[in-house]
């Protein structure tokens, strides 16, 4: 028994306490995790997709949104049934066997490597708005490697409440910026004939180009894998899960289709070609906002995006 005046030692954490601490992520945190990759895909894929899909770019992104909905529902169901880390590899093991699980794991790993490489190089293209040499040569490589190193370090440190809050704030700011670009772009440039006029199905674009463009739009869906890998650390009831699925899907449709419409109207397809596919390939969103007017607005948004 403790002597009078002495503080009692803190009680050892019970299994229930540990469980509460561990299962601490809610729907806002998961939305932030999912949206970081989805939002980044607009910044690097818009130019490639527009260069291949041309006037069908909005429809390609709409199809990507439908595919995201189906994929997201699959992940939500799988994560609810099997609350283990590793996402699709766990689902594949339960549904099929260890071999299929192994193949799925390596495919996801390769997808992550591709996404990291593309995102880090694209980031340098946007940073070049502040300092042009960052967009090419050795400076670009050095900055890209530094970004990869920072991401690796952040993932080694793991999640914390502060990091989750910071990520959520960044996601909200990014959503606001993208909605602002969409709103201004639609007011300044929207014209349905500008989108449909250059479309000649089978030739401009070709069906193979449309399929390739659609494949590019799905690269960032690995964010679902990231969120699914945290399924054992979340506190989501049916209502919270429904809110997460609805908000993520609504955001994808609005941002993807909205940005695609603004892209092909602000930088229209001419003679089966768009500047988004070459001149603005590395930083397509900057290519869009520099077309805005007045010039002061374009200059401001150039640095904001």
Show where each model-derived region lies.
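Membrane-water interface regions at transmembrane-helix termini and the short interhelical loops
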Residues: 78-80, 103, 125-134, 147-173, ...
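TM-loop-TM module centered on a large, flexible mid-protein loop between adjacent transmembrane helices
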Residues: 91, 97, 129, 133, ...
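Juxtamembrane interface elements at the cytosolic ends of transmembrane helices
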Residues: 2-13, 43-46, 72-79, 154, ...
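Hydrophobic, membrane-embedded alpha-helices of multi-pass small-molecule transporters
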Residues: 25-42, 147-150, 184-187, 200-254, ...
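Membrane-interface "cap" regions at the ends of multi-pass membrane proteins
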Residues: 1-56, 69-75, 84-85, 195-204, ...
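Extracellular loop-to-transmembrane helix junctions
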Residues: 21-22, 44-147, 248-258, 301-302
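Membrane-interface helix termini and inter-helical loops of multi-pass transporters
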Residues: 125-133, 191-202
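Membrane-interface loop-to-helix entry segments
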Residues: 139-190, 204-205, 245-249, 253
């Amino acid at each position: 028994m403790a002597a009078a005046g002495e503080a009692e030692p803190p009680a050892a954490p019970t299994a229930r306490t540990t469980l509460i601490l561990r299962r601490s992520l809610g729907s806002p945190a998961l939305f932030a995790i999912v949206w970081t990759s989805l939002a980044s895909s607009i910044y690097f894929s818009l130019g490639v997709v527009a260069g291949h899909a041309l006037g069908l770019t909005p429809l390609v992104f709409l199809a990507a949104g439908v595919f995201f909905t189906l994929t997201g529902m699959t992940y939500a169901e799988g994560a609810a049934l099997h609350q283990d880390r590793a996402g699709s590899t766990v689902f594949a093991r339960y549904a099929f066997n260890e071999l299929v699980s192994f193949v799925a794991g390596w495919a996801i790993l390769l997808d992550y490597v591709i996404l990291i490489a593309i995102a880090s190089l694209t980031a340098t293209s946007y940073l070049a708005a502040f300092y042009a040499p960052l967009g090419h040569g050795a400076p670009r490589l050095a900055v890209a490697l530094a970004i990869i190193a920072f991401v690796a370090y952040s993932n080694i440190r793991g999640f914390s409440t502060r990091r989750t809050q910071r990520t959520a704030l960044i996601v909200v700011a990014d959503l606001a910026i993208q909605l602002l670009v969409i709103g201004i772009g639609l007011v300044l440039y929207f014209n349905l004939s500008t989108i449909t006029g250059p479309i000649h199905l089978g030739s401009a674009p070709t069906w193979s180009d449309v399929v390739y463009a659609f494949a590019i739009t799905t690269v960032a869906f690995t964010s679902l894998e990231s969120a699914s890998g945290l399924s054992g650390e979340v506190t989501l009831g049916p209502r919270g899960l429904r809110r997460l699925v609805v908000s993520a899907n609504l955001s994808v449709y609005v941002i993807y289709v909205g940005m695609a419409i603004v892209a092909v109207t602000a930088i229209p397809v001419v003679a089966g070609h768009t500047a988004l596919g070459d001149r603005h390939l590395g930083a397509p969103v900057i290519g869009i906002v520099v077309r805005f007017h007045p010039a002061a607005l374009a200059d401001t948004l150039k640095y904001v995006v």
